[in-house]
Amino acid sequence: MIGAEPIWAAGRPGPLQGAGVLVCHGFSGSPASVRDSAQYLIDQGAAVVCPLLPGHGTTWQQMRLTTHQDWYSVLPPALDWLTERTRVQVVIGLSMGGSLALRIAQLEQVAGVALVNPSVGTDSPTYRLVPLLAKVLPTVRGIGSDIKAEGVTEPSYPRAPLAAVASMRELWRLVV
């Protein structure tokens, strides 16, 4: 997937020098979806890490084999990297990355959390059926690019694996 490469940038002189920012991308997305925001923070002097979550930035078939535990597993080492290099660390999460940001803030020491359109639950009764549906229906139509800006698209999967959606629901229960 184009732009899926993780972001690892050490801090430099600027107004945010000494700050470390861990950025968590969303479900079926990749660092491509937060690259512009991350670059702004880097330009301001912050050290920024946006890891590629396991099963993301590849194919929906690979995502289908991962769980929220796998997605979370890359965050503590990224936060450790920032902690070694910066005075203060914050976490930013986009969509499902918001749930991951909340989870790491529950378990690790961070100075702050910023959530952008966080995915932390739904009122849809259909979601209660996802664990059962995942056993007979492996995927549904993917979220796709939901950016409204003209000419801007977000790389994403054409299909969403229901097993991964079910795991995301488990993550929601941990953070809400």
Where are these regions (language model features)?
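Short beta-strand-to-loop junctions in surface cap/lid or active-site-entrance loops
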Residues: 1-19
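The conserved beta1-alpha1 loop
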Residues: 22-28
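The alpha/beta-hydrolase serine catalytic core
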Residues: 111-112, 118-176
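The serine-hydrolase catalytic nucleophile loop
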Residues: 28-39
